[in-house]
Amino acid sequence: GAIDRILALRPDLVISAGDMVAGQRLPHLGTVEVDAMWRAFHAHVSNPLRAAGIPLAVTPGNHDASAYRGFEAERQIYGEQWRQRRPDLEFVDDAGYPYNYAFSHGKVLFVSLDVTTTGALPEAQKQWLARVLAEHGPRYRHRVIFSHVPLWPFTQGREDDFSGDPELEKLLQDAGVGLYLSGHHQAFYPGSKDHVHFVSLACLGAGPRLLIGDGQRSERSIALIEIDGPDLRFAAL
């Protein structure tokens, strides 16, 4: 399975782009049901990674921490789950963990954005990101952003399901962000625009999607990101 492959690769860290459990349902799920899904996720994913000494950095998705009205309880449970499982990372700004936060590894600055809804990023979070990138970004060779909902669309059926925030895009460009990882569109695609790599991550569960303009469904996969000196390499495995 995917976890066995990850354990065999021995990566420096693992990033999850959200939707680790299947919440955001109507009628709303109860706490018992949501907790049971988290227990299963930890048993199959979190615990094996922790036992192997591989940190897991998470970002909220709409199915595990939706910011849409009515899912406040699921969002709170997400926070409780990951505050109890805080990874062994060098945090640069952890006030918003496990939603929006920043950490470093080697010469790379990683920033999680809390993006579980479509439309522009809230102004307060944009200001926070600008401050983190201005204060800490210049110390690192690479700056990597990750969130659930992408900045731009990748797949069929989700053409309108993205943030599309031009102010955020300009902020990334001005701060020299080299890589933006996202989930939600359930297909692997390594693209780039104006010196920023935008990599959409495939899913491991249900619902692989067709890329826009493509007739072939994306396979389930994990993405291997290799950062070697000035170079960034991406592959779906």
Name each model-derived stretch.
Residues 26-141, 167-173, 179, 191-228:
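Extended active-site neighborhood of metal-dependent phosphoesterases/phosphodiesterases
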Residues 136-155:
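Short acidic, glycine-rich surface-loop motifs adjacent to enzyme active sites
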Residues 154-164:
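Outer-membrane beta-barrel translocator/channel fold
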Residues 18-19, 61-62, 148, 183-184:
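Active-site glycine-centered loops adjacent to acidic/histidine catalytic or metal-binding residues
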Residues 1-35, 124:
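N-terminal active-site segment of His-dependent metallophosphoesterases
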Residues 145-151, 180-188:
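Histidine-centered catalytic micro-motifs
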Residues 12, 143, 178:
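Conserved acidic residues
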